[in-house]
Swiss-Prot record:
Pfam families: DeoC. It is an enzyme of class 4 (lyase). It catalyses: 2-deoxy-D-ribose 5-phosphate = D-glyceraldehyde 3-phosphate + acetaldehyde. One of its GO terms (molecular function) is deoxyribose-phosphate aldolase activity. Its EC number is 4.1.2.4. Keywords: Cytoplasm, Lyase, Schiff base. The active site is at 105 (proton donor/acceptor), 168 (schiff-base intermediate with acetaldehyde), 216 (proton donor/acceptor). Pathway: Carbohydrate degradation; 2-deoxy-D-ribose 1-phosphate degradation; D-glyceraldehyde 3-phosphate and acetaldehyde from 2-deoxy-alpha-D-ribose 1-phosphate: step 2/2. Signal peptide: none annotated. Belongs to the DeoC/FbaB aldolase family. DeoC type 1 subfamily. This is Deoxyribose-phosphate aldolase. Gene3D superfamilies: Aldolase class I. It comes from Corynebacterium jeikeium (strain K411).
Amino acid sequence: MTHFDRSKVTREAVAAILDATLLKPEASRDDVAALVREATELGCGAVCVSPSMLPLGSVPPSGSLGTDATLRIATVAGFPSGKHASLVKATEARYAAQLGADEIDVVIDVAAALAKDQNALLAELITVREAVPHPLVLKVIVESALLDEEQLRTAVRACVQAGADYVKTSTGFHPAGGASVEAVSIMADELRKLGKLAPFGMGEEERVAAGLVGIKASGGIRDWDAALDMIEAGATRLGVSAAAKVLGA
């Protein structure tokens, strides 16, 4: 594995992989508008908001992505419990896409992951993937803090087989906790074994063309060092609720 030189990682490179997130139930449209403005100014790659906040309307170019690129819009499905029927998750995801979402972060049935029931996970995730085919980006939240190593590896394999674009650690809402370096490292190791691990800094088009899968670490990433820890462990996206603080802006 290539040595990771933290000193060479730029603020711009990290900003480009940030999903600036606002999923609090009390968030208003004004709060979301402020999030979009800040994310745009910081050069973040995406914002992640609740489905009820869609559509967002006109979204300005994001500085880190070039003058012709716009901030990507992500939302959630089956959130935060994952205890929705598969068809409900799929319908929620498809409707969000119709309202302008570019990316869907869907929560798995964690009970199936705990049971290492790969068939159940596959059935659910394939249903959602079919509802939001490429070029829509599908990120699968596995709630990694609840899973032991083999359960986590099983979930990662199911995500890959179902055609997910990213495996995501956490909702950030479960009391078990959010992302950890250990969990991200396990996820990266499993993707590496499958020949599917996307490297840090790879563009979306290049990742899709190569058939690789990224890792989104989310939950508890509050500063620059924590962000670099996750990237070093294998994360290629970071979900954060305080992007300016993470970037030291």
